[in-house]
Amino acid sequence: MFKYYGVFNIPMYLTLFRIIMVPCFVAVFYWPIYWSPMLCTLIFFIAAITDWFDGFLARRWNQTSRIGGFLDPIADKIMIITALILISEHFHVWWMTLPISSIIIREILISSLRECIARVDNKNNISVIWLSKVKTFAQMLALIALLCRLNEWTVIMGVISLYTAMLLTLWSMCYYVYSVSSILLQYKLK
């Protein structure tokens, strides 16, 4: 349908847009006006929608690229980790920091593991599993609810979703580490 013009195509622009939106929602998060949580949540939601949309369009229009495959997960991590840090800083209690730090540690560990596997064996890679998709959904639900903070029930729903995301995060991390352990052991033996 659309002609491919090298690296810069619509899916790539959406990925770059997502990265550019991060400083915007950070700035809005700290605005000292009563509706800043709603605007911050709206910006985050729009950025999150582009995450789904850029992958869909890249596959649909056959505009996938190596740089897009590299930048897309980085844009996701930047957006999610920034939102998690803002939420942790806002609530400033251990029972929020615990799941948030667990999720951040997992994101860094799995990203490092992907890089390690790519260097050791380019034939194998860590593909996304259904569990990670469920984790991402719970995580996005938690982030939207906790950024928005409409009322007490929204915060409670956000905290429940955050702990659900943490459990799914740890489960998927164990799965990923187990699934690549044979590749890592082969590399260690060489």
From Swiss-Prot:
Disulphide connectivity of cysteines: none
UniProt GO molecular function: CDP-diacylglycerol-glycerol-3-phosphate 3-phosphatidyltransferase activity
Keyword Lipid metabolism recorded: yes
Keyword match Oxidoreductase: no
PROSITE patterns: CDP_ALCOHOL_P_TRANSF
EC number assigned by the record: 2.7.8.5
Pfam families: CDP-OH_P_transf
Reactions catalysed, as given in the entry: a CDP-1,2-diacyl-sn-glycerol + sn-glycerol 3-phosphate = a 1,2-diacyl-sn-glycero-3-phospho-(1'-sn-glycero-3'-phosphate) + CMP + H(+)
Gene3D superfamilies in UniProt: 1.20.120.1760
Segments crossing the lipid bilayer: 18-42, 66-86, 92-112, 151-173
Intervals, Periplasmic compartment: 43-65, 113-150
Protein name: CDP-diacylglycerol--glycerol-3-phosphate 3-phosphatidyltransferase
Name of the gene this protein is made from: pgsA
